[in-house]
Design a protein with these regions (language model features):
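Basic, ligand-binding patches in group-transfer machinery
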Residues: 1-318
Length: 318
């Protein structure tokens, strides 16, 4: 139980300064916050008293409504004054970026700073059970140095794996969760503008064994009627020519089913765009124009392909 302060103006309450949270993920998809209320000289002075209503407050960035904020009650966890709050794997969070705050009664919530994170469960070798929903939460440091949690909630989900750019094609391995691959399954490239038509290529079962980190299935439990399926596909880059446009990649499990956005979320990297860099491949269209094609991950960790028409200077520099 968190102790109540003598009064709202007590020195103990005022000692809360630059609160910081260590985060630990578990294999079920839960997330634990261990909050230090002060640091440096303030920390050595002893643990501040905080109200019983103390909580970690998560706010979904740029969103409003009852499902855009969540309070996680804090309880005293250790003699050193740290407080602990838990986000269970069964708690359903909307997909997005959740900013983390410390709230103490009627006081204005304070932004939490990031501490030491233990995310080993996100990159473990345990097999992922078949799930109706995949819920992923990754704590990270924002560009302003604050703590936030990146979340995904998808059903079904197509997880991108090994990707190779060579021989005028993108060769891709992946895994489908929450649905079955049929004989009519295909990889689709959808242009972001209406000037071009979608491109389809067949996918084939991939027998190469791979392991993925475990993810949570909020609320809905295990769907034994659907199973994990590995797949592989080859997308000829020439099929994305000519023009200058972006193509988004989707997996259609069966001809009569809706496509599933292809992405990569089952690890400890919240922003793939800055980390995963793939080489550009030079491709020539039928009219002889040189193009550059490069796969990349979007800000939401979805997989896309950027196709650009090379300028004369770029072509001559080759």
């Amino acid at each position: 139980m968190v102790a109540a302060p003598p009064d709202a103006g007590s020195p103990a309450v005022r000692r809360v300064h630059r609160p910081r949270a260590d985060c630990t993920t578990d294999s079920a998809g839960g997330l634990t916050f261990r909050v230090r209320l002060c640091e440096g000289a303030d920390e050595e002075a002893g643990a501040p008293e905080v109200p019983e209503s103390a909580a970690v407050l998560l706010r979904l960035r740029h969103q409003h409504g009852p499902d855009a904020s969540l309070r996680l009650p804090l309880a005293r966890a250790a003699a050193d004054g740290r407080l602990q709050a838990s986000l269970p794997s069964t708690t359903r969070l909307r997909e997005g970026r959740w900013d983390a705050y410390l709230t103490l009664g009627d006081e204005e919530p304070q932004r939490l700073l990031p501490g030491v994170h233990d995310l080993r469960s996100l990159v473990g070798s345990a097999s992922v059970d078949t799930q109706a929903w995949l819920g992923v939460r990754i704590p990270y440091t924002t560009k302003y140095g604050n703590l936030a949690v990146r979340t995904w909630l998808r059903r079904p989900h197509a997880e991108a794996g090994a990707l190779r750019v060579a021989d005028d094609a993108i060769t891709l391995q992946g895994r489908l969760y929450g649905a079955r691959l049929s004989a009519t399954a295909c990889l689709e490239a959808h242009p972001r503008d209406a000037a071009a038509s979608s491109v389809r290529v067949p996918v084939r079962p991939d027998s190469e064994e791979r392991s993925e980190p475990q993810a949570a299935a909020p609320e809905h439990g295990t769907d034994t009627g659907h199973s994990v399926r590995d797949f592989a596909a080859e997308l000829p880059l020439g099929s994305l020519l000519p023009g200058h446009r972006v193509w988004d990649l989707w997996l259609r499990p069966a001809e009569d089913e809706e496509p599933v956005r292809l992405g990569r979320i089952l690890d400890d990297i919240p922003d793939k765009k800055r980390v995963f860099k793939y080489p550009s491949q030079r491709v020539t269209s039928r009219d002889g124009a040189a193009h550059s094609a490069r796969p990349y991950y979007t800000i939401n960790n979805n997989l896309s392909v950027q196709v650009s028409v090379e300028t004369l200077a770029e072509a001559e520099a080759e």
